[in-house]
Amino acid sequence: MKAAVITFPGSNCDRDLATAFEKAGADVTRVWHKDTALPEGVDVVGVPGGFSFGDYLRCGAIAARSPIAAAMIRHAERGGYVLGICNGFQVLTETGLLPGALMRNAGLKFICRRVDLRVATADSAFTSGWAAGDAVRFPIAHHDGNYTADPETLARLRGEDRVAFTYLDNPNGSMEDIAGILSANRRVLGLMPHPERAVEEAQGGADGMGLFRALLGGMALV
């Protein structure tokens, strides 16, 4: 399986994300924000964490209008897989590939620690390695991770089983404890916690590998 990991000015988790894909068995290509096309035959696009373009205007707003973002949107619209982590989640909401917005944390402070999550659905390639209700632990590192959406969007996410992860102890004020959501076709996932920072026991736990292995396995079955 082939993965492409985007690098924007200000990205700081792109190498971690590429390494996680490689550990799961993917052939990884790094792409630059000025590129106008994805590599031939890419199965999944990874949008990493960091502070793309310094978080100017809004987190992810400038990155969402970069040349490579247009190629990513086309990939998603064709049914391709996309994984956006932290700033990558913010980029996905700015592009419209995922609904809602990521606002300033309720406590108005940057949060950097490990959090416990509940796998809210196993019905996606990203989460199929777990059962709904399983607990996993990933790091978080964000200032603007407070997921916000209108009541209609929240009801749709619940009704369509598109909430992928929830916080067991909400650290940032996210509505309904939401930590990650899926697109309508379940092939785009955005989440604020960092599974790519939890792929080796030396990092304090390897729960994140469950996501990457499940994703590659799920894509292979399509």
Curated annotation (Swiss-Prot):
Stored InterPro entries: Class_I_gatase-like, PRibForGlyAmidine_synth_PurQ
Its annotated pathway reads: Purine metabolism; IMP biosynthesis via de novo pathway; 5-amino-1-(5-phospho-D-ribosyl)imidazole from N(2)-formyl-N(1)-(5-phospho-D-ribosyl)glycinamide: step 1/2
Q: Where in the cell is it found?
A: Cytoplasm
Any one GO MF annotation of this record: glutaminase activity
Please indicate if the UniProt record lists Hydrolase as a keyword. yes
Specify the Glutamine amidotransferase type-1 domain's residue ranges: 2-222
Pfam families xrefs? GATase_5 (PF13507)
Tree of life domain: Bacteria
Entry protein name: Phosphoribosylformylglycinamidine synthase subunit PurQ
Protein source organism: Cereibacter sphaeroides (strain ATCC 17023 / DSM 158 / JCM 6121 / CCUG 31486 / LMG 2827 / NBRC 12203 / NCIMB 8253 / ATH 2.4.1.)
